[in-house]
Design a protein with these regions (language model features):
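Accessory alpha-helical/coil subdomains and C-terminal extensions
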Residues: 1-84
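C-terminal non-catalytic interaction/assembly regions of soluble proteins
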Residues: 52-175
Length: 175
């Protein structure tokens, strides 16, 4: 049975500081530790990102970054607990040696198809991984129009989120 993460803070759910701290205390009381995963896109009850900066991306969206130190500071100040945070995108960039074979196959196929599309003159598309039907994992690469991807977001279905809003449920894990 999976143990961690114990709390997952999702952008689909408004961050509730009190609920977050109470859940953290409860998990620590039970297990002696608590692992938290947080999206940079989580917002407070005023609709502001917890980690928003003044910098904007190419689409005019707020540049995010800093939710981990924000939560770390909150836990330190409110719960008086030592804690550690890490930004996982650094791990992805520096740990190719522990990538799964599937990840490597996906990366190579996406890159090869991007080159193939460019050489053949396809514009306004990007390669995407399309999962096959059935229990056995199969996949293929297809072109997708950038107009259906760029500057859009796909939200996690509410049916995948626990009632307390602090994790994903079995349906999310199994799908």
């Amino acid at each position: 049975k999976r143990d961690a993460p114990h709390i997952i803070l999702l952008p689909e759910i408004i961050f509730n500081q009190k609920k977050f701290l109470l859940k953290g205390q409860d998990v620590i009381a039970q297990k002696g530790y608590c692992v938290i995963v947080a999206s940079e896109g989580i917002k407070n009850n005023k609709g502001n990102f917890l980690s928003e900066s003044d910098t904007k991306d190419a689409f005019g969206h707020a540049q995010l970054g800093g939710v981990a130190p924000y939560l770390s500071s909150l836990v330190s100040k409110k719960l008086k607990l030592k804690n550690h945070w890490a930004v996982s995108d650094y791990l992805q960039r520096s740990a190719r040696h522990i990538a799964s074979n599937t990840d490597l196959l996906h990366a190579e196929a996406v890159g090869a198809h991007a080159i193939k599309y460019a050489i053949s003159g396809m514009n306004g598309v990007m390669p995407i991984i399309v999962r096959g039907k059935g229990k056995k994992y199969t996949w293929k690469i297809e072109p997708a129009p950038l107009s259906k991807i760029a500057n859009l977001e796909k939200k996690l279905p509410k049916t995948f989120i626990t009632k307390d809003g602090l994790n994903v449920n079995k349906q999310a894990i199994d799908s």
